[in-house]
A protein has these predicted regions:
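Short helix/loop capping segments that flank catalytic or ligand/cofactor-binding pockets
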Residues: 136, 190-192, 218
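A short, charged helix-loop
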Residues: 174-204
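A short secondary-structure junction signal
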Residues: 157-159, 192-194, 210
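Short, structured patches in soluble enzyme cores that scaffold and shape functional sites
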Residues: 148-151, 171, 183-185, 211, ...
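A broadly conserved detector of short glycine/acidic/proline-rich loop/turn motifs that flank catalytic sites
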Residues: 151, 164, 185-187, 213, ...
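Glycine-rich flavin
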Residues: 31-169
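Internal, well-ordered alpha-helical segments in soluble enzyme and binding-protein domains
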Residues: 99-103, 141, 177, 213-216, ...
């Protein structure tokens, strides 16, 4: 099992500087690739964008250097993940790097040989019961699925080629491809891992989704501000009306709350690793908070924009639709609120330390 060491203040400062540089690099790649608005709700993987991310090392930031990664941490990964979410560009960064790649590195899997000329993309999924179909994000674009199988006596990890699976494709709320797949269990060559690895997988997914929600929320807030200052009704900008001001204020305040909780969680995980109780508490709080804030942000943003915000040409729905999907993935808001209660009631850590550390 991999272990994330505690970072010193100097290492943390260096990681933050690197994260800022990577954020700018990701922004340049995404802005260069920005073209005409899509004319369909479906948002398949842009091969040119993904190729640019692979070429610059952003597609596999946290991977081990020996396996072709950059050996980066959560601060750097969150910067790139958030930039893509803010741009409204669907990319499997969480699935490919922070989940599938991490599972493969942790279990010591060699990886499957590449097939064809397409991107060597992996996605991840968790099997909780044998024979039950699970949702696999980006299955149509991926070459393989790295599976965490918790249906047996002990968690196991294995990798299977998508070509060997029966895949029922569909479209996620945000427009990105996903599929319903019945994954095999008790696979020959599967590697047994600890329960801590299974727990970390879920916390990784939750933190990644919280990062995406917070970043998209900031972009949504800016769209709202731009709209109310330029849209004129009854001879003045609609931002002059008190009811509209209240809607915008609620969007901005919920966004700030989500951003604060997510930043704290990322920083805590970067310092202490996801096996630390304080880090787990911070992740649970971030996902619960981001999920709760998402409801207010999406509702108010569409009230502010009116019908124009739902059109395919407008950037609002390209950010609000993914947020609605992300808030339910890797645990709902209620699930993580229950997890917070569990950590407080049954955990060894002091509540004050969990909140203030």
């Amino acid at each position: 099992m991999t272990h994330t060491p505690t970072l010193t203040d100097d290492q943390l400062a260096e990681a933050q500087e690197t994260a800022a540089e990577l954020r700018n690099l990701a922004r340049d790649i995404l802005s260069d690739a920005a073209g005409e608005a899509p004319d369909t709700v479906e948002r398949p993987l842009d091969p040119a964008v993904w190729a640019a991310l692979e070429e610059t090392g952003l597609a596999r930031l946290t991977g081990l250097e020996a396996a072709g990664g950059s050996d980066a941490g959560w601060l750097e990964a969150a910067a790139v993940l958030g930039e893509a979410a803010a741009a409204g560009t669907p990319l499997p960064l969480l699935e490919h790097d922070l989940l599938a790649g991490w599972l493969r590195d942790t279990a010591g899997l060699p990886g499957l040989p590449p097939s064809g000329d397409g991107p060597v993309l992996a996605t991840a999924a968790e099997v909780v019961a044998a024979g039950r179909a699970v949702t696999v994000p980006w299955a149509a674009a991926a070459a393989s699925v790295v599976v965490l199988d918790v249906s047996g006596a002990a968690p196991q990890v294995y990798e299977v080629a998508v070509a060997d699976l029966e895949v029922h494709e569909r479209v996620a709320v945000g427009g990105e491809p996903q599929a319903a797949v019945t994954l095999p269990t008790a696979v020959a060559g599967a590697v047994t891992v600890s329960q801590e690895v299974a727990d970390e997988f879920r916390h990784r997914g939750a933190l990644g989704r919280a990062v995406q929600i917070a970043a998209a929320a900031e972009a949504i807030t800016q769209l709202c501000v731009d709209h109310v200052t330029t849209r004129v009704q009854f001879g003045r900008p609609i931002g002059k009306f008190q009811a509209v001001q209240q809607l915008v204020t609620d969007v901005a305040s919920e966004t700030a709350l989500a951003r604060t909780m997510v930043d704290r969680a990322v920083l805590t995980v970067a310092r202490h690793g996801l096996q630390d109780p304080t880090a787990q508490f911070a992740v649970a709080a971030a996902k619960a908070c981001a999920g709760a804030s998402a409801e207010v942000i999406v509702r108010n943003a569409h009230q502010i924009h009116g019908a124009i915000g739902t059109t395919l040409e407008h950037g609002l729905q390209r950010r609000t639709r993914p947020v609605l999907g992300w808030r339910r993935e890797f645990g709902t808001t209620a699930d993580w609120e229950d997890r917070l209660e569990e950590l407080v009631v049954t955990g060894d850590a002091d509540l004050w330390d969990l909140i203030t550390r």
